[in-house]
Amino acid sequence: MPLFSILTLFPDAVEPYLGASILGIAREKGLADYRCVDFRDFARDRHRTVDDRPFGGGPGMVLRPEPIAACVEWLEREHGPFRKLALCPAGTPFRQPLAEELSKTERVLLLCGRYEGYDQRLLDELAFETVSLGDYVLSGGELGAMAITEAAVRLIPGVLGDDRSANEDSFHGGGGLDHPHYTRPRVWREREVPRVLFSGNHESIREWRAERAQERTIERRPDLADNDN
């Protein structure tokens, strides 16, 4: 059963999400488990200090390496080696292929940054991969860690009610965007569902969906369309 361990200064912000919706269902089914650890608990001084001023000057504070390293090493003694990812705006963009990899990984550790970021020696010493959700900056990595966990866990067979849901998502297999979806009523505010979708002709429906997905990808994400060629 895959274990996702999230290292954060704000476990109370993360733990409720891990017990809700798809993530909670996966845990109840015994298909995934989570551990949320406050790395401040591994600070050695009486003030439980986890940050300090940056060498070379500049604004903000930098996370010290010692408490985080102690936390990671304790977890690896408890459970064994983890694949370690640090959330960081300067990291590699998170994409669906990585979610697919993580869904098949036995132990994943997600480190949530704060302040100006991490001491680089920590990332180098413990062989962290750095991952970013996008070209913007948040105050911490907690939202990113929760997003990555859900993106991976929902791909584990048996988590979703129908495994085809994950196989037909946008980006599956490194592909393009998903096609438009419709449900009842057939007409809403004079907007009608495309007739092909209730024609009963499954081949025509597949072709229509593939064409609409390609059109949407070219319009909204031409970079993905280029990758498909």
What are these regions (language model features)?
Residues 118, 122-167, 171:
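Structured adenosyl-cofactor binding patch, chiefly the S-adenosyl-L-methionine
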Residues 64-114, 120:
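S-adenosyl-L-methionine/SAH cofactor-binding core of RNA-modifying enzymes
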Residues 5-7, 35-37, 83-85, 108-109, ...:
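Hydrophobic/aromatic beta-strand patches that form the interior of the parallel beta-sheet core
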Residues 43-46, 51, 55-69:
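A short aromatic-anchored loop/beta-hairpin motif
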Residues 172-228:
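Long, charged alpha-helical interface segments
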Residues 2-41:
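Glycine-rich, flexible N-terminal cofactor/catalytic loop recognition
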